[in-house]
Amino acid sequence: MKEQIAGFEVEHVHGPEEIPYKRDELVVLCLVRDGEPWVRSFIEHYFSLGAKHIVFLDNDSTDGIVSTASEYDNVTVLRSKLAFGAGVEGIVGERLMRRYLIERFGSNRWSLCVDIDELFDYPYSDVIGLDSLLRYLDSKSYTAVTAQMLDMFPEKLSVNSRQEPIKGLRDEYRFYDLSRIDRSRMRKDKDASRNNIIESDEVAVRVRGGIRDNVFGFKPLLTKYPLLFSDGTLEHISVHAVRNARVADLTCVLFHYKFYAFALEDYWYRAIEHKRGRGPFMNRRYEQYVEVLEKNTELQLKLESSREIASVNDLLENGFLVASEGYIGWVDAEEEKNIWQADPQSKPYELAAAFLESRRLARAKTLTVGRLERQLLEHRRQEQIKDQRINKLKEQRDSQGQKIQELKEQWLDRDQKIQRLQRKQQRLRKRNDRLKKQRANVAASRTWRLVEGLHRIKAKALDVRKR
């Protein structure tokens, strides 16, 4: 079956072209170019998570990702040469290809659209399966789930140091840092214009920053909507935006292994070159990557504020992820059901009940601690904003004081000039008075009268001659 995206042919390379699956089963969708270093970790993670099928849409790769992905069952590989940054009727090629995947494989069912360097996980995935998560979302009629990207990194990273893909990616890249994370409330008018329903204020938050702010000096937007139920009204605008969505009351995580690319020999440079042409904003960002990576052969990433990931649930307790009481109640009920189904003759009953109760209390505590952590961070953020405003007012006050001092000095200088002019004017008046007196004295003298008489005689003589 041949299909097209904006006039570009979609070639089928491997795996089934049609994928039947139930409402509580998940297909993973991935638009990828040159993703061979990640592909095995990617496939193994999502199958271990419980995904039914994985679909790759390869965008003209030059490495071996297509052949590597084609080694696996329950994997479909497609290929298109539509340019990543090409504009087609005002929509870039990247978005067109993602929409194609969602509309073709996710119609009236759940799909997870992620990048090759993103590994999705959700709160209490150690307790409930992926099918249970999807049933919970269906029970609430949700059509979109928010996920926050979390950059993972090793203690140290040597730029351009690796030629072969790493085997234990998650083991080596096990650190994260929340010290430069910024959270901001979503604008209600913007959500209204997109016709999204977000019932939870804790979910209606955009997250930016993180370790890339430390290293490269910019705050990337970390909030995405990867898990979608395409019901015919929901619209995928971009990885960071949806329209006509009913957004779930919990957030999930995308463990992000972008820093791994920087360790691969020349890989990061090729990837950046491929993504140029996406507009001046993105070009400036990629220039920042290049500038830092060309100057530093080694990046010291692990700081005092860095933490080692043990479980996705850690991110609930430290406030990075959120979940509602309704979701926690679902997890509690699923755990209880699973225990009794696994061993219906469990004895003594009191021990099992006590175990379940302790687990419930622990999850309730985690939820409370997470909320307190977010409140503390918000309080600190407000204090920082307050301090910034105070400092700005002080600067304005100092600036105004300096201007007042400058005006005083100008006024004083003007007064001094006026006084000098007044003194000069007084001197001129005195000199003028002296000259007047001198002239009067001269006019009154005998010599002056004699001179005037001679002038009169001379004038008469001239007059006689003329006659």
Task: Give the role of each language-model region.
Residues K2, G90, Y124-A352:
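Catalytic-site signature of metal-activated, phosphate-bearing donor transferases
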Residues C30, L57-S67:
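Ser/Thr-glycine-rich phosphate-binding loops at phosphate-binding pockets of nucleotides
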Residues V66-C113, D121-D126:
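Active-site-proximal specificity loops/subdomain of glycosyltransferases
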Residues M1-E44:
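N-proximal low-complexity "stem/linker" segments adjacent to membrane-targeting elements
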Residues K52-D60, S80-K81:
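Short beta-strand/loop segment that forms part of the nucleotide-sugar
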Residues E44-K52:
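Short, acidic, metal-binding catalytic loop of nucleotide-sugar glycosyltransferases
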Residues I339-R467:
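Boundary detector for helix-to-coil junctions that initiate low-complexity/charged tails
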